[in-house]
Every structure is written in structure tokens, then in C-alpha cells.
Amino acid sequence: MWFMYLLSWLSLFIQVAFITLAVAAGLYYLAELIEEYTVATSRIIKYMIWFSTAVLIGLYVFERFPTSMIGVGLFTNLVYFGLLQTFPFIMLTSPNFILSCGLVVVNHYLAFQFFAEEYYPFSEVLAYFTFCLWIIPFAFFVSLSAGENVLPSTMQPGDDVVSNYFTKGKRGKRLGILVVFSFIKEAILPSRQKIY
């Protein structure tokens, strides 16, 4: 009896490890796609914001969700549209980004408060959290590194495009989520180096 119990915990550990690696690989691939197709990503995020807005309005009209929760959700979507204006360049210190992070916390608080008082099946609660609270911040999070590989578009007075690109515009290291995933990939599966 104890042997089967031990095997069940071991199998659970292996399954969690495989799921974690699969999610990391998927996020890495998604971040690569976002870096490659920033214009399409911006358009997709815009459509996701519109969809989330329609869902919030539908929840207010058909399900009679509280006005405060829907209002904060709609205001959050408006702030997301503001973040989309400078996409793929998202400054982590901009007031718009800080406000969106704060509104995510407020939205979660209001949602937890509402669903603690009103009973809804778990699948419906998960649907609300997915479409109204998680999908858009997740899209912005995955696309944080998308602005690093875009060609330089602004110059300082006295600089020409070529020298700006090769000196000041060039970074020694990449930053963002892709660096983290690359580090994890190299730590788990080190690449072979050719020896001549």
C-alpha cells in the first residue's frame, strides 16, 4: 500500500515537471512570434480588448453584475488601449503601465468579493477571470520583450541613422522574458559548441 502511494507522488512530480516545461516552451514560442509580428500582435490585443469590453457589457446587461465591478473593468480596458498606443514599447515606469497594474489588483479584489457573496459554478467564475481579468495582461506580459528588436525610429540631433543603430541603439544584452527563457533552456538543455 505504501509503495503505490509513493509511486503516485512520484508520478505527480514528473507530470508537474512536464507540464511546466510544456508551458515554458509554449511561452517561449509565443514570445518569439510576438517579437516577429508586432503589428499583428497589436491588432490581436486590440481585438481582445474589444472582446473583453463586449463581455463586460454583456455581463452587466444579462447577468446584472455590479456596476462598480463592470465600471472598473471598462476603465481598465480604456487604460489598456492607452498602453496599446505605444506598443511594442511599454515603459514599466509610465503612469499608464503603473495604473494598469493597480487596476488589475482592484479588479481581482472586486471579483473575489463578488464571487464570495454570489454563487456561480467554478467554470463560470473561471470564464470571467479568463476573459475579463487575465487574457489581456497576459498578452502584454508576454509581449514585453517585443520592443527590443524593433529598428530604431528616433534619433538625437547630430546623429545619423547608421551610427545610432550600430553604437547607441545596439545593446550588448537582450532584456525581457526571452532572456529568462533562453537562460532556462541553456540550463536544462545546454547547446553543443563546435570545437575546431
From Swiss-Prot:
Q: Where is this gene product found? A: Membrane
Q: Which residues cross the membrane?
A: 3-23, 42-62, 70-90, 97-117, 125-145
Which is a Pfam family this sequence falls into?
Answer: Erv26
- Could you tell me what this protein is called? Protein TEX261
Q: Name one GO molecular function term.
A: COPII receptor activity
How does this chain sit within the bilayer?
Answer: Multi-pass membrane protein
Belongs to which family?
Belongs to the SVP26 family.
Query: A GO BP term, please?
Result: endoplasmic reticulum to Golgi vesicle-mediated transport
Q: Which PANTHER family match?
A: PROTEIN TEX261, TEX261 PROTEIN
InterPro entries noted in UniProt: Svp26/Tex261 (IPR007277)
Q: What is the lineage of its organism?
A: Eukaryota, Metazoa, Chordata, Craniata, Vertebrata
**One Gene Ontology CC term in the entry:** COPII-coated ER to Golgi transport vesicle
Keywords from the named record: Membrane, Transmembrane, Transmembrane helix
